[in-house]
Amino acid sequence: MKIAVGCDHIVTYDKIAVVDYLKTKGYEVIDCGTYDNIRTHYPIYGKKVGEAVASGKADLGVCICGTGVGINNAVNKVPGIRSALVRDLTSAIYAKEELNANVIGFGGKITGGLLMTDIIEAFIRAKYKPTKENKVLIEKIAEVETHNAHQEENDFFTEFLDKWNRGEYHD
């Protein structure tokens, strides 16, 4: 399995630790940078990770910045990417099993290195569990990636709200 990993300058050492961990586990790593602590911008590396995954060069991706918010937003702009900002195992497993996430994002200043590697391993091992409901939801989310007139209409998500009101979704 190939895993793309990227970060900004704030968490380079965290990324290096993640890359080293993944390699010791036998995964092939595509290190998308950055490689030092010289100031840079997280969107560059979020985009690189997203493109590696979306193109099929990598199977999964990991993005890290200070809080995780910026780089996760950036990677989610790449068509075909479903990334979740996670800080715990439950969220990472849910993202993979229910939403077929292909990237996870971390805040290196928020989540410690040992916890990050545990979460990454849980994410890698989790398997997407397709259901009729989550397939439809994932398809609807994918429609947002491409501009179409319908997404500008106020009723774009009405079908899902109606299902919620009928009790078809459960928390």
From Swiss-Prot:
InterPro entries: LacB, RpiB_LacA_LacB, RpiB_LacA_LacB_sf. Its EC number is 5.3.1.26. Pfam families: LacAB_rpiB. The keyword Metal-binding does not apply. The keyword Iron does not apply. Pathway: Carbohydrate metabolism; D-galactose 6-phosphate degradation; D-tagatose 6-phosphate from D-galactose 6-phosphate: step 1/1. GO terms for molecular function: galactose-6-phosphate isomerase activity; ribose-5-phosphate isomerase activity. Gene3D superfamilies: Sugar-phosphate isomerase, RpiB/LacA/LacB (3.40.1400.10). Keywords: Isomerase, Lactose metabolism. One of its GO terms (biological process) is galactose catabolic process. It catalyses: aldehydo-D-galactose 6-phosphate = keto-D-tagatose 6-phosphate. HAMAP family: LacB. Heteromultimeric protein consisting of LacA and LacB. PANTHER family: DNA DAMAGE-REPAIR_TOLERATION PROTEIN DRT102, RIBOSE-5-PHOSPHATE ISOMERASE B. Belongs to the LacAB/RpiB family. NCBIfam families: lacB, PRK05571.1, PRK08622.1, PRK12615.1, rpiB_lacA_lacB. This is Galactose-6-phosphate isomerase subunit LacB. It comes from Streptococcus agalactiae serotype V (strain ATCC BAA-611 / 2603 V/R).
